[in-house]
């Protein structure tokens, strides 16, 4: 952008959560760009407008391939601020493991955030341990897909679940946008169960920050605080009145948090 100090300009790479796509950053992206930053929002495989079908994606690494290809193309002298939301924290961690030298800091928003000690499945299981045991799934559906001999199950959020658990602080129009654009979710539980811990040399060498969403009814707020305290970050922030989708319900505040993190640590 003309007139922007090149030293202050940052490159933010935005990684969406399960079922979502690059579209979910539609409010935040122009806000960061209006501040002079470069912003790249990606679609992971079988997400957003990516043309892959869910039954064509076997592993979490496959699912994360668009992000890994983007990171591979980043020039050696450039570093990005990697921003992962929700389940996108796993893809963010994979990118950190493979390209630590290209990331100035990774920011996790209401997201799973592994460490360099435990396997990823440890944190995957903790999400369910922290979640209410008697939670009503409402109109969420579990659907089989793929090979009939070895079927997998996908999750499809219904309008009631979206509006009351994930987008409860968003407008009717924003919720309808999600209803129209969300795609089925596969959580790669079997793949995660076989994965080894991320390394201290790769993932563990990248600075981390965390942004808690204070009214999150989807990803337990208590678990978000637990991750901050037990996994460790160099900066933690909390967005008041934010539901799980802070980039939609509180985009200005999220932009401010990201700017403050970038200014402080980059």
UniProtKB/Swiss-Prot annotation:
InterPro entries: AB_hydrolase_1, AB_hydrolase_fold, MES/HNL
Active site feature: 86, 216, 244
GO biological process: alkaloid biosynthetic process; jasmonic acid metabolic process; salicylic acid metabolic process
GO MF entry, a single one: methyl salicylate esterase activity
Record has Hydrolase as a keyword: yes
E.C. number: 3.1.1.123
Keywords: Alkaloid metabolism, Hydrolase, Serine esterase
Organs and tissues of expression: Mainly expressed in roots.
Pfam family for this entry, one: Abhydrolase_6
Disulphide-bridged cysteine pairs: none
Sequence ranges assigned to domain AB hydrolase-1 in this UniProt record: 11-121
Highest rank taxon of the organism: Eukaryota
Substrates-to-products reaction catalysed: 17-dehydropreakuammicine + H2O = norfluorocurarine + methanol + CO2
UniProt family annotation: Belongs to the AB hydrolase superfamily.
Function according to Swiss-Prot or TrEMBL: Hydrolase involved in the biosynthesis of curare monoterpene indole alkaloids (MIAs), natural products such as strychnine, a neurotoxic compound used as a pesticide to control rodents, and its pharmacologically active derivatives, including brucine, used to regulate blood pressure. Curare alkaloids act as animal glycine receptor antagonists. Catalyzes the conversion of dehydropreakuammicine to norfluorocurarine.
Subunit organization: Homodimer.
Protein name (record): Norfluorocurarine synthase 1
Organism in which the protein naturally occurs: Strychnos nux-vomica
Gene from which this protein is expressed: NS1
């Amino acid at each position: 952008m003309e007139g922007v100090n090149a030293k202050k300009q940052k490159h933010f790479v935005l990684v969406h959560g399960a079922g979502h796509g690059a579209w979910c950053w539609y409010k935040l992206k122009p806000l960061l760009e209006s501040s002079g930053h470069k912003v790249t929002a990606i679609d992971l495989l079988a997400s957003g407008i990516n043309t892959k079908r869910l039954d064509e994606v076997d592993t979490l690494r496959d699912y994360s391939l668009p992000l890994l290809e983007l990171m591979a193309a980043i020039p050696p002298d450039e570093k990005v601020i990697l921003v992962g939301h929700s389940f996108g924290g796993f893809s963010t961690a994979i990118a950190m493991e493979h390209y630590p030298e290209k990331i100035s800091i990774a920011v996790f928003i209401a997201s799973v955030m592994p460490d360099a000690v435990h396997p990823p499945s440890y944190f995957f299981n903790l999400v369910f341990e922290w979640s209410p045991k008697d939670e009503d799934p409402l109109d969420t559906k579990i659907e089989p897909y793929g090979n009939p001999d070895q079927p997998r199950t996908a999750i499809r959020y219904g309008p009631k679940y979206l509006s009351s658990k994930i987008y409860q602080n968003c407008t009717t129009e924003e919720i309808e946008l999600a209803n129209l654009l969300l795609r089925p979710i596969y959580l790669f539980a079997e793949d995660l169960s076989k994965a080894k811990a991320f390394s201290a040399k790769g993932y563990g060498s990248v600075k981390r920050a965390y942004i808690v969403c204070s009214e999150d009814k989807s990803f337990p707020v208590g678990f978000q605080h637990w991750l901050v305290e037990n996994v460790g970050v160099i900066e933690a922030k909390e967005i008041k009145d934010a539901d799980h989708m802070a980039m939609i319900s509180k985009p200005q505040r999220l932009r401010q948090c990201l700017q403050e993190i970038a200014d402080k640590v980059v």
